[in-house]
From Swiss-Prot:
Modified residue annotations for (3R)-3-hydroxyasparagine: N158
Distribution of this protein across tissues and organs: Highly expressed in liver. Secreted in plasma.
Family annotation (PANTHER family): COMPLEMENT COMPONENT 1, S SUBCOMPONENT-RELATED, MANNAN-BINDING LECTIN SERINE PROTEASE 2
Entry protein name: Mannan-binding lectin serine protease 2
Domain Peptidase S1 intervals: 444-683
Active site: H482 (charge relay system), D531 (charge relay system), S632 (charge relay system)
Keywords noted in UniProt: Autocatalytic cleavage, Calcium, Complement pathway, Disulfide bond, EGF-like domain, Glycoprotein, Hydrolase, Hydroxylation, Immunity, Innate immunity, Metal-binding, Protease, Repeat, Secreted, Serine protease, Signal, Sushi
Length: 685
């Protein structure tokens, strides 16, 4: 179906080009009278052959035998096309003065051909005459011989019975259907300088064209025109540019017309708008012209770079719309008055002045460094020097806080105090953990009171009951889950006190809970497995000799909590007299074999509780040393011999009703089993 449509379109195109129908075939045979017998005397016969427009006639002879005479004066066949005689033929073979057709083929110069046969009054021999055949054939108008005129300027397309012309891109076919006129109007040039030329320069410019070139610069510029290389525009010796001409128009005057072969002089237009028109006629073969245009304007004063800065680009002169930017050296910033600038560019105006004053390059000032919580800052470069490359030193309060980095900061080019690792934030003073003045010895049940600085991590929890906890950071407290059960929603009833030895002392550091986290595996009233909790404080507490966190156990801590290894526990719990201790008491107690402890509680079960892998036991087989009610949540601590710091290994959880009884060991939550849980809560709060 698509093929039929295409064939139909092609047929429509050809029919349009040739007319409403194909031309009738034109062909035939011509012979002399009596052929192939001899022809008679006094014979005159003419044939006028006609072909359709766009065709020509082709004729050749298959037999030719005429009387030979000087210049074919007696008998002859004459071929005529229009007014031109193509050939006069006689004889059988050509001589110096006579021509016989032989194997030649003859073509008409147009669509018609006249054939004339003539014989005189006598023939000495019998001559048999001629036989010729003719036919019409399409003329390829696009094929031209050397020296013939070309029918089309650019492209020639032949078809049966005719031809048509087309043009290259940038040209349009003139209404004469042969000439390609240039599309060269409406061109606009806005650059300060440039070149423009006639179409195809330096080749001959097109005929029948009208070109317009517009140079449009901003007000304040003056355009100058220089004709360069060569100039060749058709002229007339007696008239001023009647054929092809070049004219130049400004808002003030007109220049030209120009033609001929002499370069026109420089034209200083004193205008920012110039229109150049170029018109050509239908004849001639000239190469055209080329113009280099430039522009000038009132210059601005040469800019001067500020100290510690430079200007770019650097030019010999700066005129209208020229610009420059100011850049400061590293460590300096652009300042216009007191206003800092991200960048600066000035533009030359038409009156010869810059649109903005040049700024200064002021040294970067990082400003006073922020105060460091639990630390201080020292100026290294000089007293209160805070400008580019100045150095400061942050330090933590000695003994109680430590810093992981070296604390040295430099004022950098971006205006920020920056550490050697590229950090912009303040260093952190982390509390020192596990420092104590405690030495082994003493008891809770029959033990000794603690001295100031022995257990600075000890926390007193007051509410409906008395309990304890251990400070593990300056805003986190570790305790037993059962000690704070029910406090997750009623946190206001939880009174947290630190830095005291006497339970009823009026001098203490007060803290309030922000959040309470009880281990998700703890079930109140169903034993003490996972008896661990964290309290997030609303505010950080200040670390000092009497308030300091206990360390969390290292991975190697298990080797320090083996059976018979001694730990220490402190608290205000019940003493042997059955009353809560007024002073903070402590005792050193050994670790008990886990299986031995579990077996002991199987014999003397604590109601609803059993010893699990999440617990450890401590105490003496004979009794006498133990924690008791009121000590819940307190820390069972051990000394790390390698670091010489104390760490929390257990949390006071549960035990026999008879504290310190024979084979009635204290049971503690095993902290090493909960390090990931503790770190996850703290890191994600």
């Amino acid at each position: 179906m698509r093929l039929l449509i295409v064939l139909g379109l092609l047929w429509s195109l050809v029919a349009t080009l040739l007319g409403s129908k194909w031309p009738e075939p034109v062909f035939g045979r011509l012979v002399s009278l009596g052929f192939p017998e001899k022809y008679g005397n006094h014979q005159d016969r003419s044939w006028t052959l006609t072909a359709p427009p766009g065709f020509r006639l082709r004729l050749y002879f298959t037999h030719f035998n005429l009387e030979l005479s000087y210049r074919c004066e007696y008998d002859f066949v004459k071929l005529t096309s229009g007014t031109k005689v193509l050939a006069t033929l006689c004889g059988q073979e050509s001589t110096d003065t006579e021509r016989a057709p032989g194997n030649d083929t003859f073509y008409s110069l147009g669509p018609s051909l006249k054939v004339t046969f003539h014989s005189d009054y006598s023939n000495e021999k019998p001559f048999t005459g001629f036989e010729a055949f003719y036919a019409a054939e399409d003329v390829d108008e696009c094929r031209t011989s050397l020296g013939d005129s070309v029918p089309c300027d650019h492209y020639c397309h032949n078809y049966l019975g005719g031809y048509y012309c087309s043009c290259r891109v940038g040209y349009i076919l003139h209404q004469n259907k042969h000439t390609c006129s240039a599309l060269c109007s409406g061109q606009v040039f806005t650059g300060r300088s440039g070149f423009l030329s006639s179409p195809e320069y330096p080749q001959p410019y097109p005929k029948l064209s009208s070109c317009a070139y517009n140079i449009r610069l901003e007000e304040g510029f003056s355009i100058t025109l220089d004709f360069v290389e060569s100039f060749d525009v058709e002229m007339h010796p007696e008239a001023q540019c009647p054929y092809d001409s070049l004219k130049i128009q400004t808002d003030k005057r007109e220049y030209g017309p120009f033609c001929g072969k002499t370069l026109p002089p420089r034209i200083e237009t004193d205008s920012n708008k110039v229109t150049i028109t170029f018109t050509t006629d239908e004849s001639g073969n000239h190469t055209g012209w080329k113009i280099h245009y430039t522009s000038t304007a009132q210059p601005c004063p040469d800019p001067t770079a500020p100290p510690n800065g430079h200007i770019s680009p650097v030019q010999a002169t700066y005129v209208l719309k020229d610009s420059f930017s100011v850049f400061c050296k590293t460590g300096f910033e652009l300042l216009q008055g007191s206003v800092p600038l991200k960048s600066f560019t000035a533009v030359c105006q038409k009156d010869g002045s810059w649109d903005r004053p040049i700024p200064e390059c002021s040294i970067i000032d990082c400003g006073p460094p922020d105060d460091l919580p639990n630390g201080h800052v020292d100026y290294i470069t000089g007293p209160e020097v805070t400008t580019y490359k100045a150095v400061i030193q942050y330090s933590c309060e000695e003994t109680f806080y430590t810093m992981s980095s070296n604390g040295k900061y430099v004022c950098e080019a971006d205006g920020f105090w920056t550490s050697s690792k590229g950090e912009k934030s303040l260093p952190v003073c982390k509390p020192v953990c596990g420092l104590s003045t405690h030495t082994s010895g003493g008891r809770i049940i029959g033990g000794q009171p603690a001295k100031p600085g022995d257990f600075p991590w000890q926390v007193l929890l007051l509410g409906e009951t008395t309990a304890a906890g251990a400070l593990i950071h300056d805003d986190w407290v570790l305790t037993a889950a059962h000690a704070v059960y029910g406090k997750t929603e009623a946190m206001s009833s939880l009174d947290i006190r630190m830095g005291i030895l006497k339970r009823l002392s009026l001098i203490y550091t007060q803290a309030w809970p922000e959040a309470v986290f009880i281990h998700e595996g703890y079930t109140h009233g169903a034993g003490f497995d996972n008896d661990i909790a964290l309290i997030k404080l609303k505010n950080k507490v200040t670390i000092n000799r009497n308030i300091m966190p206990i360390c969390l156990p290292r991975k190697e801590a298990a080797s320090l909590m083996k059976t018979d290894f001694v730990g220490t526990v402190a608290g205000w719990g019940l003493t042997q007299k059955g009353f809560l201790a007024r002073n903070l008491m402590f005792v050193d107690i050994p670790i008990v074999d886990h299986q031995k402890c579990a077996t002991a509680y199987t014999k003397q079960p604590y109601p609803g509780a059993k010893v699990t892998v999440n617990m450890l036991c401590a105490g003496l087989d004979r009794g006498g040393k133990d924690s008791c009610r009121g000590d819940s949540g307190g820390a069972l601590v051990f000394l790390d011999n390698e670091t010489q710091r104390w760490f929390v290994g257990g949390i006071v959880s549960w035990g026999s009703i008879n504290c310190g009884g024979s084979e009635q060991y204290g049971v503690y939550t095993k902290v090493t089993n909960y390090i990931p849980w503790i770190e996850n809560i703290i890191n994600n709060f």
